[in-house]
Amino acid sequence: ARRIAKAGVECDQVPPTKFFDKLFDKLVWKKVRARFGGNIRFCMSGAAALSPDVAEFIQMVGFSCYEGYGLTETAPLVAANGWAGPGKSRLRTVGLVANGVKVTIDTDAWDDPDRADEGEIIVHGPNVMKGYWNNEAATNEVIIEPGVFRTGDLGKLDKDGYLSIPGRVKSQFKLENGKYVSPAPLEENLKLSPLVEQAVLDGRNMKNTYLIVHPNMEAMKAAMQDAGVDVSGSDADICASQTTRDWLLGELKAKNMTAPAWKGYEVATSIILDPVEWSTDNDMMTPSLKVKLRNLLSHHEAEIAKIQG
């Protein structure tokens, strides 16, 4: 880790140069790389936000680790780390825009005065689809003109041209104090906890945010027992217990909901625990495994009302 920090290189592989680094690499990391076949040149991540901690660990093992961004409608690549060469990658971004593609940020689609440089990502280029098959209405919603596609994703371009994606424009919500919250990256952060299987952060038009969590029951019960917390009863009883909820919320506040990933107003003050896994079978997930937020909020309507007071 010190070797990588000293090199000042993000995402790219940093070969060991000093004696003890080489020795440790031979004794430990070489064996880890061998478990993956021994021939991996680099790792790519897409579809969801890549945790910087995960990326840095993969880099420490000895692989370059790059995050990219694209959509089916853009065939698919829009931006990526790694393609521009060594030293041209940046953590917490999806990299530089690909050759032949142009990205603009429509700030009119987003009205948070504290984040005025963010907006909807608009993709321009020959890679943009002509339209959705036999669905002119859906096509007209996203195709501004031929070769120009409205993604629905919230984005920001920094001064060096690196693109970052805080979330979806439509998934953002505003708190009572006027602050906007982008839940997607925060939910991914929560799912790094071994105690959490699925998580949703909400709080639209409320004073504070709250969580709905489907916990890893076995991991949570074991951790609670170690902490001296009673775990008797069924999974439903444990999840309904205020003691359990207070304990898990405290754990997540201490280990996940921390700066710089979380701003103070984003930190949840309440939690609802759902003992049942969200799936397509109970209509809580789409076929592409995205949470059906409306269904989930409706299912927990009574508990949400208690939080609202």
Features from the language model and the residues they span:
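Gly/Ser/Thr-rich phosphate-binding loop
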Residues: 1-89, 102, 109, 197
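C-terminal boundary motif of the adenylate-forming
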Residues: 106, 152-154, 159, 193-219, ...
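Alpha-helical "lid/cap" subdomains adjacent to substrate-binding clefts that gate access
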Residues: 1-38, 217-259, 275
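Conserved ATP-binding/catalytic segment of the ANL
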Residues: 110-116, 120-175
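Adenylate-forming
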Residues: 128, 162-191, 220-242, 262-266, ...
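Conserved C-terminal "lid"/linker of ANL adenylate-forming enzymes
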Residues: 173, 198-202, 249, 253-309
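Conserved loop-to-beta-strand segment in the C-terminal subdomain of adenylate-forming
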Residues: 117, 204-229, 258-274
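Short Gly/Pro-enriched turn/cap motifs at secondary-structure boundaries
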Residues: 91-97, 143-146
